[in-house]
Amino acid sequence: MSKTYHFIGIKGSGMSALALMLHQMGHMVQGSDVEKYYFTQRGLEQAGITILPFSEDNITPDMELIVGNAFRENNKEVAYALRHQIPFKRYHDFLGDFMKSFISFAVAGAHGKTSTTGLLSHVLKNITDTSYLIGDGTGRGSANAQYFVFESDEYERHFMPYHPEYSIITNIDFDHPDYFTGIADVRNAFNDYAKQVKKALFVYGEDDELKKIEAPAPIYYYGFEEGNDFIAYDITRTTNGSDFKVKHQGEVIGQFHVPAYGKHNILNATAVIANLFVAGIDMALVADHLKTFSGVKRRFTEKIVNDTIIIDDFAHHPTEIVATIDAARQKYPSKEIVAIFQPHTFTRTIALLEDFACALNEADSVYLAQIYGSAREVDKGEVKVEDLAAKIIKPSQVVTVENVSPLLDHDNAVYVFMGAGDIQLYEHSFEELLANLTKNNQ
């Protein structure tokens, strides 16, 4: 039976994906959000889903309300619903109920969730009817699907309503210092989540924190080293992607190619292969569809503007920065790697300042954008982007959206824009600068 859903905060990456999924399943879907452009809204607009400014008038009694996790009682629509005792569900609570209708495949972990969810969704949907929800704002819904692939987020323990049949956990790392007190707190959250997985877990076997995880369901370890249950080996990394074999209990289960770059993407693919092998999916079909994966939004997204290579990536943690630069070096081994990075949240910048500096030193040159504070925090002046610049050994300087011309001081370079805030504004300024230079030279 068709329902009407109203999403409060529809531009959120998970919310927009869920909205698309429900829309494709035949439900009426609309939502509200701030006016500022966010990369997820393009997909919503293409689907014909209405995006409204926040207003009490958006809410009618016949709707089911789904509220984004960032929106609290000070939001006028949330306040209206509370005042009139109109029931609503948080995104993660709704998802926890929704997945009960499917055999569900979850992807959790500090880093690599979106890329791995995207890869698993791509392979499975090309083999059989599959619904999925990816953290880049992409969703697909099918009422007839047997399988549901989704991203499982640890922030504020949002994954606790989830009880999937299978779950990959890519890694454990200290992040979200505004919520987690330290690495032990992060591990405890993942351990609680792991206990809810019903059939099998697939965890990276070379992560010391992950190896402490205990769960009633069988745990399969994957990685590069002997001793793992699924081992990636005979690895060849080229400018066309990565080739490797996977063995399980001494038996080769397949030879695979992924058109992706960086060691982390080989691990992501190995996790997907392990999960689908245990779920009984034909490995020949898995190999076929791994070859055609085109990536997910804002994860090593490339474009060429006037012969200049630009990469856009969501990387906003030191581990992710290292992985993104590693991927850029694999694809462009003869080019200078120029990193343009915007720190995301003051709390994360303070907690990981030294780690950010070490990670950015993997690039050849570094440019920094002003820190992007989250809506949940206030800039108390405890850290400035110049503090990070001072700790970076490689050539570095701070740029503004209005003046990105220092980026032109490089020949034969790849420009890697990284961040989870509004780093794309800097990228667009650079693209405009390149376009204007070309016009002036004609």
Swiss-Prot record:
Chief localization: cytoplasm
GO BP terms, alphabetized: cell division; cell wall organization; peptidoglycan biosynthetic process; regulation of cell shape
Record's keyword terms, sorted: ATP-binding, Cell cycle, Cell division, Cell shape, Cell wall biogenesis/degradation, Cytoplasm, Ligase, Nucleotide-binding, Peptidoglycan synthesis
Residue intervals passing through the bilayer: none
GO MF terms, alphabetically ordered: ATP binding; UDP-N-acetylmuramate-L-alanine ligase activity
Gene3D superfamilies: Mur ligase, C-terminal domain (3.90.190.20), Mur-like, catalytic domain (3.40.1190.10), NAD(P)-binding Rossmann-like Domain (3.40.50.720)
Record GO cellular component, one term: cytoplasm
Alphabetical list of InterPro entries matching this protein: Mur-like_cat_sf, Mur_ligase_C, Mur_ligase_C_dom_sf, Mur_ligase_cen, Mur_ligase_N, MurCDEF_pg_biosynth, UDP-N-AcMur_Ala_ligase_MurC
Compartment(s) where it occurs, according to its Swiss-Prot or TrEMBL record: Cytoplasm
Assigned EC number: 6.3.2.8
Record protein name field: UDP-N-acetylmuramate--L-alanine ligase
The gene coding this protein: murC
